[in-house]
Every structure is written in structure tokens, then in C-alpha cells.
Curated annotation (Swiss-Prot):
Residues 515-814 form the Protein kinase domain. It is a single-pass type I membrane protein. The modification Phosphothreonine is found at residue 673. Disulfide bonds join 287-299, 293-310, 372-394, 376-382. Residues 836-872 are annotated as: Disordered. It comes from Arabidopsis thaliana (Mouse-ear cress). Residues 283-322 form the EGF-like domain. It is an enzyme of class 2 (transferase). Residues 851-861 have a biased composition (Low complexity). Its EC number is 2.7.11.1. Residues 27-443 are extracellular. PANTHER family: OS07G0415500 PROTEIN, RECEPTOR-LIKE SERINE_THREONINE-PROTEIN KINASE. This is G-type lectin S-receptor-like serine/threonine-protein kinase At5g35370.
């Protein structure tokens, strides 16, 4: 009996041990110095290492659809029963099955194991050390400190989905993936606007939540967030007490998820039994999806079956290789560059609609059709027009052309006619023949041409002989020069090994890719930039550097290897290089939205929304923080300005020209401020002989941030309100005046900060789509960045923390910002001189007395620094 009892006890212990071991691989908490990979946990829990307490959600490194043979893995949170991914971190940078997720006291990082220790994704700088990582019952990943206070949570950084209990706040968006097997950011997104939920394709609105037949508008209060509830979908206001727009769904406590699908639809699904059931989908008409039939594809909806069919408009055919509708005529083509000169327009006919005409205003009213065409012809980004006959309104289609929609039985849409912009190809027409009588002219022509041909042949032979002699003389000189050690021309790139060197291009390759450097898209102190296309149709930007200070190929390659090894989502990637003689060429990835300077200041395109500006500011700060503290070697950019902040898809900012200051020679470096046109962004220490540190970049970033807030250059014409307080025998009177003229915006921002009037600083084109608190946040960060003393400026890592809320906002120190008053005074004086010459108008502002206003220093070095840091 005793032995039987001991045997049962042993079996029970083994069973408990088995349960413990099997559950140990998936737990609710993990702690710092924890490393996970798909390979490590694939056998015990199919890649999961975190499991919520209710066992509804799991977290780990997974591949789309749970395919373990996939080459792309993502650190994700997944609904266990349905397999739905509700959040992923490294969606644009998948790792292999051996890639790791590392938890340290500094946060989470995802690393491609075996390739580099540079993370492909990481959490931002945190306010305090991490003590644990938790997966909640709602599917929220939390980083907790020693007091169990949340330092970071995945719900604040949604990807394409939100679930019960999660809030998608005003200005935040869900970005659909490229496809269901590719989690990379696609072209569609769902954005929470101030009055509605908006769906966008490549930044263009194409649908609103309240357009759905099941949507009910309950109030007109400004929207604060979108939420998924047990009873449906709702846009909420007034701290969650008022519903603005609601979509009622059957009450259920089951798992419910709202997702921006890769198909371009916004879908709400519920897990019922064993499957996900779609409860809501918008838009209901598939032909309202901008790219449902590809570029210029014509979508036709069958009302009976609710299925759409795709075709091409009349006089166009499908290019099967590219999936694009192109003209049938071989003499016509879609314009591929701004160089097209011979422009034609193909009429699409009546009843053909385009989504953007429902969401944008016409550029002009009361125009004849030819004038509408002329506007498009002069606009490089214009791809076509839609013309409304009754109102004679002109709508432009810019940047991207999506699918067309065939409209049936809708008289108001039959008034709109579309036209596609086309290029007329040049034909090599033969010159008209000579209509000779009797053929007697041939001997005459021969008698004239033969002596001339002989004469020119002798000249050509003489030139060839002279060139051969010149080449021989040049070769002998080159042989002497090449033998000198340290010469940039000497040595072959293969004679020494430098790890991390990017791809080397031949000069002829780049010459062909750029069509002999035909299309210049930029220029600056480092040289000109040209657009090019590689044989695989990858777009590139080629930068020519003609004056450099390097003395040998090995030194050049070492610097290029350092730049080429830098990988960050907010830094322009160096794809390769070419060295030919004294000429250096750098090959970068191409940014399709150009520079921030053109997007923000040109006024031609749509206005950057506040959330887009915030994202650009945050992304730029992250890129600079990585250069300053994330690289093996600290890199000071030295030239932070809107022209060097490029915008990729979805206006993702990428910093260019980093690391290039070492390639300048001493002569060009001494002309740094004038040659590169950056006066107004450079910190005062550039001229005062103080040490240059990464804080010089912080100053430049602060100036750029102020321009993001106002939407104009820091020195520009604008309206300004001035409050003046007068004291006459203890009778106080206050007046407010509004004047227009040249304004030095940093000084204006300082004045408005002291008075707490932040809304006067925001870009008026936003028309109130920004709150005072949002404007205050950016202005305070910017003013902290432009402190005169470098030691008082925050690091870029601290700036990122202030943006993300993990670090309290800094307080600008007035005593370190009084130099802006001196700059403003000098600017006003110079502007008045110009105004007297009839060149510009200036304005003098009343200034209220401030107790902390100190006298401006006017030493020689201080005034000299104004020439660099002051308004340009």
C-alpha cells in the first residue's frame, strides 16, 4: 500500500513538472536581459514567448499566416484562436527565423541575428529603466518600471488594427499592409480626423466613415478618438462622454477587431466560433477604392451581383507587363518625367468618374477647357484633368493616377469629363525625297559630294593623329603621378579591403541610368543631384561631388564605408558609389516626395496636416539622435535644414547629406555658410570659435521645427497681432493691432510663448485643425533647442523623449534666448533700409517690458555670429 502511494505521488509530481515546463515557454511577464527568437520557441509554442493571462493573445516572432518556412518574421501580437495579427513592430523590416527580440532595461529591440547588431526596430528612449514586459488580457504590450507604471505600450503605436478597449486618437492612423503575406506599409490608411474617420490613398482622401449607410451622426463636437466597443464602432468626443459618429453592430463580448485592410477597405470583424465574421466593411462600392483596377483601369460595378469588372478606357489597352492602361497609339505614352514637351490629352468620355473630384476643390472656376489643359501642362506633377462643363471648373489629378469608375444613371456625373495627360513621342521621319526628273541629278550630286567627302576625311585623319599623340603625352604624365603615394588617383579599389563598403558602380552605369545626367533634381554645397533609373527600374538619386578634400582612394572608401553602414528608417540609404578621377559620385535611394522645403513652402500641393508635421518632426529627431548616439562613430550633420529633409512614401522623413562634411576640402569648408546657403540655421558657435558639437545640429533642428509650426520660412511676410499696454496716470489701456510685413519668426515665437498665445503661431492654412496644446508642445521644444549656450540645449535623444511623452517638456530659459531680440532688431534695421529702396516693406512691433530681458551683447564675435545664425 505504501509503495502504491509513493508511485502515485511520483506520477503526480511528474505530471505537474510537465505542465510547468510546457507553460514556461508562454508567460504573461518577461524581464530584462531576455532574448527570444522564432527558432528558440518554435517547438514549444510556435514562436510565442508571451501569453496573456486569459490565453486570448500571444506575442512572439511570427511569420504571416504562421508559415514557419517564410523568410520574414515580425515581433507581433496575435489573437490565438483566429490567428489575426493585431500589432507588429518591425513591419517594414522583417527578420529571418534566427532574428531576435531583446528586452533590456533600456527597452525592446528587434535585431537581424548574424548580420548586424543595429536594431531594425526599437522602442523610443524611456523615462526610467524597464523592470518587466507584460502582455495584457486586452492584447496590449506594456513596458513597466519598478512601480508597475507604464513606460510604453503598443496600443499607442497601432499598425493596421485596433481591438476592444483600444483608442485611435485624433490625428493617429491605421496603415494597411501591402498584402496579407507582406506586412510592409501599403498605400491605404484610415485617419481619425476632427469631424470624421477618413480613408486615404497616397495622402488623398477617398472615403469617410459617415458615408456608410449604417453610420449615424449624433453630434458635431470635435472628434477625440475612435474606439471599438461591444456594441459597435464609435467616434467619441468630450473625453468619451459624447458620440459623434456611431456604427451599431450586434452586441457581443467576443473578440472584435477593426482593420485597415490591404484591399483598401476598412473592415470590422468578430470571431464567432471558429471563423472571423465580417460585420462592417467600407466603402461598400468596390469601385470607390482608388487602385482597385490599377493605374487608369476602368472599374464597372455590376449592381445585381455587386461584383466589379476591370477594363481600360476607349483608345487605351492593358500593358500586361506593368499592369497599367496605356494608349493604343504607339505615338503616345504616359509622361514619365518633367522633360516632356509635346503634350496631348486623351478624352475619357462622359460617365467616367474619379474619386479625388469628390474630396478636393477645383483649382479654378469659370475657365475654358483649353485653359484647364494649359494649367496641367505647366504643372510637372499633374497627370490629368477633370472638367465640369456647367460651372467650367477645373480639377487636377496630381502625383498619382488611380483607377477610374464608370458611373451609370447619374446625370450630375455626366457633366464631368476626364482627360489623361500624354506625351507625343518623337518620330524619326525621313526627309522628303527629291523628285528628280529623269534621274539626271545623281551624277551632279556625286560630283559635288565626293570631293567634299575626301576633304573632310583628310581633316578627320589629322584630328585622330593629333589626339593619339596627346593621349600618349598624357599617359606618360599620368604614370609619373600615379607612382606618388597618397594620390587619390593611385591604387585600385580591389588592392585593399575595407569592410562594409557599399556597391561600386561604374561611371558608365550611372551615366546610362541618369541619361547622361539629364534631370537635375537638386544642388547644394556638395554638388548637384540627378534622378536616375537602374536596369531593374529602381529609382535612384546620384550626387556628384566635384570638390573634395580627400587625398587617397583608401581614405575616400573608408568614409564611404562609414556612411554606407548607417541604417535607420529616418536616414536616406546610401546604395553605392563611383570614383572616377577627381570626381566622386554617391548613389542614394530616391525620395518620391522631394524635400520638406518644397512640400512646406511651395504652396502648390496640399497643405501638410498637423499630424504629418508632427511625424516629420519626430522622424527627423529620431534620425539625428541616431547619428549622434546610435552609430559606432558619432556623426554631426552640420547642415540640418528643410532642403536636407527628404520625404518618402506617406511623408516619412529621411535625412540626407549626413556624414558628407568630411568630404569637403578646406577651401570649401571655410566658405561653408555662403556656399551652402544655410544662414539662419547654423548655431552661433560656428563663428565664435567655440567647439562644434552635436548641439549645433540641435540648434538647426530647432529652427526647422519653428518653420514646421508656421508653415513658412523664419523670415517671411505674415500678419501679426500686437498687444500694447499704455500707462497714463495709473489709467491702463490695452489695444490690439494687426499688421502685415516681414517677420523674424523665432522672435515672434518667443513673444507669443511668453504671452501663452500659441495659436497665433500655427500655420493659418490649417484653419484650426490644431489645438493650442499641440502648438505649445512644438514651440517649447523648438525654443529649448535654440538656446544660445550649447550646454542648455537638449540632446536629440531627449527631444525624441519630449515628443513621445516619456520625458517632460522643457522650459525655455529666457536669459538664453534674449539673443533672438538682437537678431530681430538687426533684421528690422536691414529690412527698413531695403524698404526705403523700394525692395521690401518692414514693420516695427511694440514690445512689452519683461523683467528678465537682459541687454543684448554686441561684441564683434556676437555680431559676427548673427551673420550666420540670424535671419537669411
Amino acid at each position: 500500500m505504501k509503495s502504491t502511494f509513493l508511485l502515485l505521488l511520483l506520477l503526480l509530481s511528474l505530471n505537474l513538472l510537465f505542465v510547468f515546463v510546457s507553460c514556461a515557454s508562454s508567460i504573461e511577464f518577461v524581464y530584462p536581459n531576455f532574448t527570444a527568437s522564432n527558432l528558440r520557441f518554435v517547438d514549444s509554442s510556435k514562436g510565442a514567448f508571451l501569453l496573456s493571462r486569459n490565453s486570448i493573445f500571444k506575442a512572439g516572432l511570427f511569420s504571416p499566416g504562421g508559415d514557419d518556412s517564410s523568410t520574414g518574421f515580425y515581433f507581433s501580437v496575435v489573437h490565438v484562436d483566429s490567428g489575426s495579427t493585431i500589432w507588429s513592430s518591425n513591419r517594414d523590416s522583417p527578420v529571418s527565423s534566427s532574428g531576435t527580440m531583446n528586452l533590456t532595461p533600456q527597452g525592446i529591440s528587434v535585431i537581424e541575428d548574424g548580420k548586424s547588431q543595429i536594431p531594425v526596430w526599437s522602442t523610443p528612449v524611456l523615462a526610467s529603466p524597464v523592470k518587466s514586459l507584460r502582455l495584457t488580457d486586452a492584447g496590449n504590450l506594456l513596458l513597466l518600471d519598478h512601480l508597475n507604471v507604464s513606460l510604453w505600450e503598443s496600443f499607442d503605436f497601432p499598425t493596421d488594427s485596433i481591438v476592444l478597449g483600444q483608442r485611435l486618437k485624433l490625428g493617429m492612423f491605421l496603415s494597411g499592409s501591402v498584402s496579407r503575406s507582406d506586412f510592409s506599409t501599403g498605400d491605404y490608411k484610415f485617419l481619425v480626423g476632427e469631424s470624421d474617420g477618413l480613408m486615404q490613398w497616397r495622402g488623398q482622401n477617398y472615403w469617410k466613415l459617415r458615408m456608410h449607410i449604417r453610420a449615424n451622426v449624433d453630434s458635431n463636437f470635435p472628434v477625440e478618438y475612435l474606439t471599438v466597443t461591444t456594441s459597435g464602432l464609435a467616434l467619441m468626443a468630450r473625453n468619451g462622454t459624447v458620440v459623434v459618429v456611431r456604427v451599431a453592430l450586434p452586441p457581443s463580448s467576443d473578440f472584435r477587431v477593426a482593420k485597415m485592410d490591404s484591399s483598401g477597405k476598412f473592415i470590422v470583424s468578430r470571431f464567432s466560433g471558429k471563423n472571423l465574421v465580417t460585420e462592417f466593411s467600407g466603402p461598400m462600392d468596390s469601385c470607390q477604392i482608388p487602385f482597385v483596377c490599377g493605374k487608369l483601369g476602368l472599374c464597372n460595378l455590376d449592381n445585381a451581383s455587386e461584383n466589379q469588372s476591370c477594363s481600360c478606357p476607349d483608345e487605351m489597352r492593358m500593358d500586361a507587363g506593368k499592369g497599367v492602361c496605356v494608349p493604343v497609339s504607339q505615338s503616345l505614352s504616359l509622361p514619365v518625367s518633367c522633360e516632356a514637351r509635346n503634350i496631348s490629352y486623351l478624352e475619357l468620355g462622359l460617365g467616367v468618374s474619379y474619386f479625388s473630384t469628390h474630396f478636393t476643390d477645383p483649382v479654378e472656376h469659370g475657365l475654358p477647357l483649353l485653359a484647364c489643359h494649359d494649367i496641367c501642362s505647366k504643372n510637372c506633377s499633374c497627370l490629368g484633368v477633370f472638367y465640369e462643363n456647367t460651372s467650367r471648373s477645373c480639377y487636377l489629378v496630381k502625383d498619382s493616377f488611380g483607377s477610374l469608375s464608370l458611373v451609370k444613371n447619374s446625370p450630375e456625373n455626366h457633366d464631368l469629363i476626364g482627360y489623361v495627360k500624354l506625351s507625343i513621342r518623337k518620330t524619326n521621319a525621313q526627309p522628303p525625297g527629291n523628285n528628280n526628273r529623269g534621274g539626271s541629278s545623281f551624277p551632279v550630286i556625286a560630283l559635288v559630294l565626293l570631293p567634299c567627302s575626301g576633304f573632310f576625311l583628310l581633316i578627320a585623319l589629322g584630328l585622330l593623329w593629333w589626339r593619339r599623340c596627346a593621349v600618349m603625352r598624357y599617359s606618360s604624365i599620368r604614370e609619373k603621378q600615379v607612382t606618388r603615394p597618397g594620390s587619390f588617383e593611385s591604387g585600385d579599389l580591389g588592392s585593399f579591403h575595407i569592410p562594409g563598403l557599399p556597391q561600386k558602380f561604374e561611371f558608365e552605369e550611372l551615366e546610362q541610368a541618369t541619361e547622361n545626367f539629364k534631370m537635375q533634381i537638386g544642388s547644394g554645397g556638395f554638388g548637384s543631384v540627378y534622378k536616375g533609373t537602374l536596369p531593374d527600374e529602381t529609382l535612384i538619386a546620384v550626387k556628384k561631388i566635384t570638390n573634395h578634400g580627400l587625398h587617397g582612394r583608401q581614405e575616400f572608401c573608408t568614409e564611404i564605408a562609414i556612411i554606407g553602414n548607417i541604417r535607420h528608417t529616418n536616414l536616406v540609404k546610401l546604395r553605392g558609389f563611383c570614383a572616377r578621377g577627381r570626381q566622386l559620385l554617391l548613389v542614394y535611394e530616391y525620395m518620391n516626395h522631394g524635400s520638406l522645403e518644397k512640400t512646406l513652402f511651395s504652396g502648390n500641393g496640399p497643405v501638410l496636416e498637423w499630424q504629418e508635421r508632427f511625424d516629420i518632426a519626430l522622424g527627423t529627431a529620431r534620425g539625428l539622435a541616431y547619428l549622434h548616439s546610435g552609430c559606432d562613430q558619432k556623426i554631426i550633420h552640420c547642415d540640418v535644414k528643410p532642403e536636407n529633409i527628404l520625404l518618402h512614401d506617406h511623408f516619412q522623413p529621411k535625412i540626407s547629406d549626413f556624414g558628407l562634411s568630411k568630404l569637403l576640402n578646406q577651401e570649401e569648408s571655410s566658405l561653408f555658410t555662403t556656399m551652402r546657403g544655410t544662414r539662419g540655421y547654423l548655431a552661433p558657435e560656428w563663428i565664435t570659435n567655440a567647439a562644434i558639437s552635436e548641439k549645433a545640429d540641435v540648434y538647426s533642428y530647432g529652427m526647422v521645427l519653428l518653420e514646421l509650426v508656421s508653415g513658412r520660412k523664419n523670415c517671411s511676410f505674415r500678419s501679426r497681432s500686437n498687444s500694447v499696454t499704455e500707462d497714463n496716470n495709473q489709467n491702463h489701456s490695452s489695444t490690439t493691432t494687426t499688421s502685415t510685413g516681414l517677420v523674424y519668426f523665432p522672435l515672434y515665437a518667443l513673444d507669443m510663448h511668453e504671452q501663452g498665445r500659441y495659436m497665433e503661431l500655427a500655420d493659418p492654412r490649417l484653419e484650426g485643425r490644431v489645438t493650442s496644446q499641440e502648438a505649445e508642445k512644438l514651440v517649447r521644444i523648438a525654443l529649448c533647442c535654440v538656446h544660445e549656450e550649447p550646454a542648455l540645449r537638449p540632446t536629440m535623444a531627449a527631444v525624441v523623449g519630449m515628443f513621445e511623452g516619456s520625458i517632460p517638456l522643457g522650459n525655455p530659459r529666457m536669459e538664453s534666448l534674449n539673443f533672438l531680440r538682437f537678431y530681430g532688431l538687426r533684421f528690422a534695421e536691414s529690412s527698413m533700409v531695403e524698404g526705403q529702396n523700394g525692395e521690401s516693406e518692414t514693420m516695427v512691433f511694440h514690445r512689452r517690458e519683461s523683467s528678465n530681458s537682459g541687454g543684448s551683447r554686441q561684441s564683434a564675435s556676437y555680431i559676427a555670429s548673427q551673420e550666420v545664425s540670424g535671419p537669411r
